[in-house]
Amino acid sequence: MSRAVGIDLGTTNSVVSVLEGGEPTVIANAEGGRTTPSVVAFSKSGEVLVGEIAKRQAVNNIDRTIASVKRHMGTDWTIDIDDKKYTAQEISARTLMKLKNDAESYLGEKVTDAVITVPAYFNDAERQATKEAGEIAGLNVLRIVNEPTAAALAYGLDKGKEDELILVFDLGGGTFDVSLLEVGKDDDGFSTIQVRATSGDNRLGGDDWDQRVVDYLLNQLKVKGIDLSKDKIALQRLREAAEQAKKELSSATSTNISLQYLSVTPDGPVHLDEQLTRAKFQELTSDLLERTKKPFNDVIAEAGIKVSDIDHIVLVGGSTRMPAVTELVKQLAGGKDPNKGVNPDEVVAVGAALQAGVLKGERKDVLLIDVTPLSLGIETKGGVMTKLIERNTAIPTKRSETFTTADDNQPSVAIQVFQGEREFTRDNKPLGTFELTGIAPAQRGVPQVEVTFDIDANGIVHVSAKDKGTGKEQSMTITGGSSLSKEDIERMVADAEAHAAEDKTRREQADVRNSAEQLAYSVDKILSENDDKLPEEVKTEVKADVESLKAALAGTDEYAVKAASEKLQASQTKLGEAIYASTQAEGAAPAGDAAGAPAGEAKPEEDIVDAEIVDEEPKNEKK
């Protein structure tokens, strides 16, 4: 049987791990390091360099060296090398191929399967791109797993039998996530790890701390009248020096940045010799640190717990070695010290290897349950966002709802898929649209269209729609450019919180209009079907009320719609009384069913419009 590995495909560094005898082992690369820089370079001779060797030659080959490509995953980013365009997937695949080769050299056998980790807040396009990179590298990607979840898996398996809450604070080179997970273990030693909530920022990481130091050094040179902001080689040397200074300041209170012959100007060579203290470094990056607070607090609020309920805090990612980060986490956790027993660079890959072992049947003592970070739904009448899957729902998951048509003899329905937390689709992010055609001619409210959302274990979304009458079906997989960026997700959640009251009012108004429109339609239908049974004065009065309601619906005054609707509801009772009296007089069967009206009130024949769901599940089962 081929071997499966776990891979942490990081922004700045990557790690590969494998199970040996059921226990995870981190594999050293060909250069002897346990972490491999996520750097790819194309030498002038056409050779592809990956890892430490690529990073070392970057200064002399800056235009042909690519770092931090993870930040471009899921976008249309490309780079031209020797008249050939490379996508982010192709560059990432080079790193994965090196990890695969290093693992094969260590194991002495072929590696074909892998579990690859991604930030918890990676969207659908970014997950798809990561999976594609694995496939380009010749790997069968068993599963895409969220990095904090993998870390908790690695950390939580040796915990006690009581249910425990683990908070994972993951600050990597380019991304940031916070996740809360619950770890339980039964008497037989079987562990269940379930994600309770997750939040993050896909554009925040150690690279941003490095850039602040680079900007500071450039400004120091500018004061002396030297501008190196366009000098690519100087910028690369500054980036490398900034990264090294950041690492040194994790253990020292100051460091010296000395770069001789950084550049050459008409006035001669430029040398840089700058002392950087930890205090100055923390001052330069204080706003970056501040950005980590909201996701932390959001996760606590989303899970509905108190900070004191957290049993363990796990720091993941090399950037968590910065003293200011450790101190902030302790402060946010109410004085609780983060766990120091895990290697923040390796714990994610270890968890990925464990999950690979589970999927290959090498470990049978653990179940991993992950979540989707954002709600998914479709647009229904009135522009309402009807959610089928709520955010932080465990995945894989599948949910179906039955909808209907808004007009008589409607031949097709457009299924518009959205992602977000707002009540109206115009405030959310469109993911895609497809059309279900060939619906049999029928009155509005009669056709039943079942819409199904299916999120697989990788967090990738599939949507289908089926006409229950004809059996016709259409489907699509959400891919590529239609997925959300992290900024979009953050904005949506923030907007949803800020506009919750406004959304509630607008939703109520939409519901009133939808109900009023259905009422006018139903009463109109009763009038036409029972024309010969109704006294003229009743018909005249009710018709006038119907027209008043239609006129109100044509306007924008919500109070007028509500008032006209209430008036028609009152007058429609006369229809029921008149029809009932007429049928009794004729000695006919009760007309309630035919007219759609029980005695005393003409209820709409079926309260189904495009904005409403034919609820096939008990209310308490909806998430």
UniProtKB/Swiss-Prot annotation:
A family per Pfam: HSP70
Domain of life: Bacteria
Induction and repression of expression: By stress conditions e.g. heat shock.
Biased composition (Low complexity): 585-601
Entries under InterPro entries matching the protein: ATPase_NBD, Chaperone_DnaK, Heat_shock_70_CS, HSP70_C_sf, HSP70_peptide-bd_sf, Hsp_70_fam
Protein's UniProt keywords contain Phosphoprotein: yes
Region (Disordered): 584-623
Keyword tags: ATP-binding, Chaperone, Nucleotide-binding, Phosphoprotein, Stress response
Phosphothreonine, modified sites: 175
CDD domains from the UniProt entry: ASKHA_NBD_HSP70_DnaK-like
GO molecular function: ATP binding; ATP-dependent protein folding chaperone; unfolded protein binding
Biological role stated in the UniProt entry: Acts as a chaperone.
Family annotation (HAMAP family): DnaK
Family the UniProt entry places it in: Belongs to the heat shock protein 70 family.
Protein name: Chaperone protein DnaK
Organism of this sequence: Renibacterium salmoninarum (strain ATCC 33209 / DSM 20767 / JCM 11484 / NBRC 15589 / NCIMB 2235)
Gene from which the chain derives: dnaK
